[in-house]
Swiss-Prot record:
The keyword Zinc belongs to this UniProt entry's keyword annotation: yes
Keywords: Amino-acid biosynthesis, Cytoplasm, Histidine biosynthesis, Hydrolase, Magnesium, Metal-binding, Zinc
Record's catalysed reaction(s): 1-(5-phospho-beta-D-ribosyl)-5'-AMP + H2O = 1-(5-phospho-beta-D-ribosyl)-5-[(5-phospho-beta-D-ribosylamino)methylideneamino]imidazole-4-carboxamide
Main location: cytoplasm
Positions with a binding annotation for Mg(2+): D95, D97, D99
Superkingdom, natural source: Bacteria
Manner of cofactor binding, per the entry note: Binds 1 Mg(2+) ion per subunit. Binds 1 zinc ion per subunit.
Name of this chain's protein: Phosphoribosyl-AMP cyclohydrolase
GO terms for biological process, alphabetical: L-histidine biosynthetic process
Gene name linked to the record: hisI
InterPro entries reported in the protein's UniProt record: PRA-CH, PRib_AMP_CycHydrolase_dom, PRib_AMP_CycHydrolase_sf
Binding positions (Zn(2+)): C96, C112, C119
């Protein structure tokens, strides 16, 4: 944990910091990325986890449209760019250690590339796991043939 986040542990509600300074103090991984959890702002439903670099986060904060960093493509991934399933930013929070983001979003349609609302659809039990939701949309309709 950086000193800046250590100081925030005892900060009074309403304390203000420059976003730039907090992003400087955030704990980005060796690839310059930070995990970002997307949560539906009004229901609390956890939709997905993706990665952001600083440029993607700054774009998201500036435009209100969520942009992640695609590790597989090595470029910005503006959510909904190819599928139309856009995420609009409502809130953004850094956790107490400055190493994870929580994005409150307004998700239009499914968040998952499988066509499901959430990427978290495989429920684990001690002995068995099961799929607990069906796709809302056929992925081929979202993206065409892959």
């Amino acid at each position: 944990m950086t000193q800046r986040f250590k100081q925030l542990e005892t900060a009074a509600q309403g304390t203000r910091e420059a976003t730039r300074d907090l992003l400087d103090a955030a704990r980005w991984n060796d690839a310059g990325l930070i995990p970002a959890i997307a949560q539906q702002h009004d229901s609390g439903e956890v939709l997905m986890m993706a990665w952001m670099n600083r440029a993607a986060l700054e774009e998201t904060l500036a435009t209100g449209r969520v942009c992640y960093w695609s590790r597989s493509r090595g470029k910005p991934w503006r959510k909904g760019e190819s599928s139309g399933q856009v995420q609009q930013l409502v809130t953004a929070h850094l956790d107490c250690d400055g190493d994870t983001l929580l994005l409150g979003v307004d998700q239009q349609g499914p968040a998952c590339h499988t066509g499901r609302r959430s990427c978290f659809y495989v429920a684990l039990g001690a002995d068995t796991a099961h799929v607990d939701s069906a796709p809302l949309v056929d992925p081929h309709e979202l993206y065409g043939e892959r």
